[in-house]
From Swiss-Prot:
Keywords: Acetylation, ATP-binding, Cytoplasm, Helicase, Hydrolase, mRNA transport, Nucleotide-binding, Nucleus, RNA-binding, Transport. A motif (Q motif) lies at residues 91-120. GO terms for biological process: poly(A)+ mRNA export from nucleus; response to abscisic acid; response to cold; response to heat. This is DEAD-box ATP-dependent RNA helicase 38. ATP-dependent RNA helicase essential for mRNA export from the nucleus. Plays an important role in the positive regulation of CBF/DREB transcription factors. Residues 125-301 form the Helicase ATP-binding domain. Constitutively expressed.
């Protein structure tokens, strides 16, 4: 579809400002009824102001990247357009009529060479008038964040000191990460951004009644954003574009549906012509049907369920006689034998996190853990250290399963399979997001699922395989060094 139709050009405002500003506005969290869940998803905030000098806007040849990573080949993206607006797939960023400032950000700061497949198809849909809504699903690591960040930046008028783009995320970590991407990509534009998440400092004064926000882009979590709107801190009159990152979770009944719908309705009362972008790696049928009823006449991009798992990531399952054997598999087999970059180990409980942490730390690995006993500022510090490669292993509940982007991660271990708290049934969306933490942007990677030989873990794994129509290879003997060597070689984590 997208390769054969004609594109209507968009005019993008360029900026005369010589700086880009980004500030984090924080808010004290109020007591709420604790939600029963295995993970501890909430939010994140590490106050950092990035002010960059605008140098020459010309892009020097030596500053362009020499090569591009192989992205997942989303060859089975199904595109359904609404209306008669023609679109042309963008094979180059030059095809998008972007400002010189944004082009420099893409090439010099982001080190991009060309759009990934999801970017090539979705960006013309986002930027072409009449700016129709978009529901977009694509592989983890395929470049979805760039789609909506570039979409927001391209539609902002830097001369108007009012909020014009809003991005809503389910966690603090994801909001921070999206802010970092926006700061890099928009470094030369003069576009300002503000972070709306709960304060990481316990007892800090609430920021709900502060001065009205004048930043062009606001990125935050739904609870804080809803309060800002209620206290008139966040003006909606000039809002052009609303983004839901991890939209399946934002609009699920057990997620943030009520808050998300209220925000959409409040914006619609003031500015009915705003554009809605919904991005996620997963959309179950219930959420997909709900979105179709809620968002009017959207363009849609979807990937078949069986095509969602990344081919570059090899998945394995290991049946262990006892819990202690899982730790032995991690430290004596996988970590000891493989050529491992960085590793994320997903656990169900804080007790498991502490147990695995202790075992690996005693082996001399640089290990950190993220779980519910930590303050937000401690979580921020740990995630930041991992992203800066100061630590090798991160043990976590599902707080970072969604959207966490660290390209050096090539190993994911499911110490516990993801299941739903209420029913114990497999959480398919969380499994897919976990797998997506390895092999970012087509890099090689491996996922090891550690199962107890009690029947239940095996049943959960079988349901996951059936759901994704995938056969996960089994390591027949949990303590066979040769089998692990063979698996690691196959995954590209051990030289021949």
């Amino acid at each position: 579809m997208a390769d054969t139709v004609e594109k209507v050009p968009t005019v993008v405002e360029s900026s005369s400002s010589s700086t880009v500003e980004a500030s984090n506005s924080a808010e004290k969290t109020e007591p709420t009824t604790e939600k029963k869940k295995w993970g501890d998803v909430e939010d994140d905030d590490d106050e950092e102001e990035a002010v960059s000098e605008l140098n020459s806007l010309s892009i020097k040849e030596e500053e362009k990247p020499d090569s591009i990573l192989e992205e997942p080949e989303d060859s089975n993206i199904k595109a359904v357009t609404s209306g008669d607006t023609p679109y042309t797939s963008a094979s180059r960023f030059e095809d998008l009529n972007l400002s010189p400032e944004l082009m420099k950000g893409l090439y010099v700061e982001m080190k991009f060479e060309k759009p990934s497949k999801i970017q090539a198809i979705s960006l013309p849909m986002i930027m072409t008038p009449p700016h129709k809504h978009l529901i977009a699903q694509a592989h983890n690591g395929s470049g979805k964040t760039t789609c909506f960040v570039l979409g927001m930046l391209s539609r902002v008028d830097p001369t108007l000191r009012e909020p014009q783009a809003l991005c809503i995320c389910p966690t603090r970590e994801l909001a921070n990460q999206n802010m970092e991407v926006l700061q890099k990509m928009g470094k030369f534009t003069g576009i300002t951004a503000e972070l709306a998440v709960p304060d990481s400092t316990r007892g800090a004064p609430a920021a709900t009644r502060g001065a009205p926000v004048s930043a062009h882009v606001v990125i935050g979590t739904p609870g804080t954003l809803k309060k800002w709107m209620a206290f008139k801190r966040l003006g909606l009159n000039h809002l052009k574009i609303l983004v839901f990152d991890e939209a399946d979770h934002m609009l699920a009944t057990d997620g943030f549906r009520d808050d998300s719908l209220k925000i959409m309705k409040d914006i619609g009362r003031v500015n009915p012509n705003f554009q809605v972008l919904l991005f996620s790696a997963t959309f179950n049928e219930t959420v997909k049907d709900f979105v179709a009823r809620t968002v009017k006449d959207p363009n849609q991009l979807f990937v078949k369920r069986e095509d969602l798992a990344l081919d570059s990531v090899k998945q394995y399952k290991v049946v262990c006689p006892k819990e202690q054997n899982k730790i032995e598999v991690i430290k004596d087999q996988i970590m000891e034998l493989g050529d491992i970059g960085q590793t994320i180990i997903f656990v169900k409980t804080k007790a498991s996190a502490q147990k695995v942490h202790k075992a690996l730390a005693e082996m001399g690995y640089d290990v950190t853990s993220v779980h519910g006993n930590l303050t937000e500022s401690d979580r921020d510090k740990i995630v930041k250290e991992f992203k800066e490669c100061l630590t090798q292993v991160l043990i976590a509940t599902d707080v970072i399963a969604r959207g966490f982007d660290q390209q050096r991660v090539n190993l994911v271990v499911n110490y516990n399979l993801p299941t739903k708290y209420e029913t114990g049934e497999p959480d398919y969306e969380v499994y897919l997001h976990r797998v997506g933490r390895a092999g970012r942007f087509g890099r090689k990677g491996a996922v090891f699922n550690l199962l107890l030989d009690d029947g239940w873990d095996k049943e959960v794994m079988e349901k996951i395989e059936k759901y994704f129509e995938a056969n996960v290879k089994e390591i027949k003997s949990w303590n066979s060094e040769e089998e692990y060597k063979s698996a690691l070689k196959e995954a590209g984590l051990l030289d021949e």
